[in-house]
Regions:
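C-terminal catalytic "cap/lid" subdomain
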Residues: 1-160
Length: 160
């Protein structure tokens, strides 16, 4: 990001985020807002975080994206993945997804499924978000940032 001229700064969830005993996540929205107001781009990643009564638990990057999008009223939401979008069983990018059941079979195991559920976890998390979002690959980051609509649209019922 720095090489592309983006004033990116890391925000490490272990140092700034926690779950309460009901598993609700507190996010550093004031700090994020301050960084953004000064022209910085906060960059988060999945991490372990303190969880009241549990020690630590995993906070996925997907959960961070949706939590911050909701709390900061994001105008656009995008997740960059290792593939150019959500792929169907033939390996083609699915244009849009509005419900999980219609794509569940294609979202079985992936080559990079992790503790957050891989692509299926991303789709489920974004379907629960009350706004449209996109999943795209690394080659489409510039297009997404320029306002284009690469990859797969995920929309679980927003008003848009």
């Amino acid at each position: 990001l720095h090489a592309a001229g983006v004033a990116a700064v890391p925000v490490h969830p272990l140092s700034a985020v926690a779950r309460d005993d009901d598993a609700a996540v507190s996010l550093p929205t004031a700090a994020v807002g301050g960084l953004r107001a000064e022209g910085f781009v906060p960059v988060f990643h999945g991490d372990v975080i303190a969880h009241a009564g549990e020690g630590v638990t995993v906070l996925s990057g997907d959960e961070l994206v949706t939590g911050l999008a909701e709390r900061l009223d994001a105008a656009r939401v995008g997740l960059c993945s290792t593939v150019p979008g959500v792929l169907d069983s033939e390996g083609d990018v699915i244009d849009s997804i509005t419900d999980f059941e219609s794509v569940a079979a294609a979202l079985g195991d992936s080559d990079s499924t992790d503790v957050s559920g891989g692509m299926a976890g991303k789709v489920e998390e974004l379907l629960a978000l009350a706004r449209p979002a996109r999943i795209f690959g690394p080659d489409a980051v510039g297009a997404f940032l320029a306002g284009d609509a690469p990859g797969t649209l995920i929309d679980g019922g927003s008003a848009d």
